[in-house]
Amino acid sequence: MASSGLSSRRSIMASRLTASAEAVNEPRRGAVVSRRVEYDEESLAGAGGESRYEVFINHRGVDTKRTVARLLYDRLAQAGLRGFLDNMSMRPGDRLEERIGSAIRECTVAVAIFSPSYCDSEYCLRELAMLVESRKAIIPIFYDIKPSDLLLPQAVADSEVYLPRDLERFKFALREAKHTVGITYDSATGDMAELVSAAADAVMYNMEKMETVQRRETMILSRL
């Protein structure tokens, strides 16, 4: 019965994603994302109050916030999935680390958008380390970089700002991401609509897989 419900939900999500595909084509020429449609976080959460975030979007804002990160957030919202994107999901007065940490713990799937300046960002690295340590399903998008480019910059490694254990956490998280099958995108030749569609499909696939595993674990525990 649970399997039937999950399949039904995936079918609904897929139909919504298909119906919204044309919206992604609009910004293909440039970096500015259409703001005609805004999503109210509270309406996505439902009348009963805030629900948990299902998808965490880890990204370097200066590289991808106004393109793939925002487009993917919109696409998931149209499919009825509640994604966490910092500038869309946080409100004045929120404590940054608490809000982000809570969203990471709640999510089922994360999308990590690796871009040229990603590894220069402390926030990106800390979020990635938390996602890996929380054993979340992570979908890498290699945006204008190759997996082999995921290395801790020497400036970060030599900095006295970070504790040795933090540097090890960052290195481990980057290694894990490097060896995870992801989506590669070249902004000079790629199709943004295809990228967002592939990322949304990957989110649905991984959510179904994680929910199946959780359901099996619950069944096993109930028999003990």
UniProtKB/Swiss-Prot annotation:
The record marks 123 as: Important for ADPR cyclization. Keywords: Hydrolase, NAD, Plant defense. It is an enzyme of class 3 (hydrolase). GO terms for molecular function: NAD+ nucleosidase activity; NAD+ nucleosidase activity, cyclic ADP-ribose generating; NADP+ nucleosidase activity. NAD(+) binds at residues 60-65, 93. It comes from the Eukaryota. GO terms for biological process: defense response; NAD catabolic process; positive regulation of programmed cell death; signal transduction. The active site is at residue 127. Residues 51-178 form the TIR domain. Pfam families: TIR_2 (PF13676). It catalyses: NAD(+) + H2O = ADP-D-ribose + nicotinamide + H(+); NADP(+) + H2O = ADP-D-ribose 2'-phosphate + nicotinamide + H(+); NAD(+) = 2'cADPR + nicotinamide + H(+). Its EC number is 3.2.2.-, 3.2.2.6. Homodimer. An NAD(+) hydrolase (NADase). Upon activation catalyzes cleavage of NAD(+) into ADP-D-ribose (ADPR) and nicotinamide; NAD(+) cleavage triggers a defense system that promotes cell death. In addition to ADPR, also generates a cyclization variant of cyclic ADPR termed v-cADPR (2'cADPR). Also hydrolyzes NADP(+), but not other NAD(+)-related molecules. v-cADPR activates ThsA, an NAD(+) hydrolase in B.cereus (AC J8G6Z1). Probably makes 2'cADPR; the cADPR made by this protein is bound by cmTad1 (AC P0DW61) and activates ThsA from B.cereus. The TIR domain catalyzes the NAD(+) cleavage (NADase) activity. In contrast to classical TIR-NB-LRR receptor-like proteins, only contains a TIR domain. This is Probable 2' cyclic ADP-D-ribose synthase BdTIR. It comes from Brachypodium distachyon.
